Amino acid sequence: MQKTKMIFTIGPASXTEEMLVXFI
């Protein structure tokens, strides 16, 4: 989960990161 969060944080997904993390 942490790895995915880091990848999303680095990417252009800022707000979407929260939704994905949550989802994952």
From Swiss-Prot:
Keywords, alphabetical: ATP-binding, Glycolysis, Kinase, Magnesium, Nucleotide-binding, Pyruvate, Transferase
Q: What class of enzyme is it?
A: transferase
What does the record give as its pathway? Carbohydrate degradation; glycolysis; pyruvate from D-glyceraldehyde 3-phosphate: step 5/5
Q: Which GO terms describe its molecular function?
A: ATP binding; kinase activity; pyruvate kinase activity
Q: What is its EC number?
A: 2.7.1.40
Which cofactors does the annotated protein need, by name?
Mg(2+); K(+)
The protein's annotated catalytic reaction(s) are: pyruvate + ATP = phosphoenolpyruvate + ADP + H(+)
Similarity comment text for this entry: Belongs to the pyruvate kinase family.
Q: State how it assembles.
A: Homotetramer.
Name it.
Answer: Pyruvate kinase
The taxonomy runs: Bacteria, Bacillati, Bacillota, Clostridia, Eubacteriales
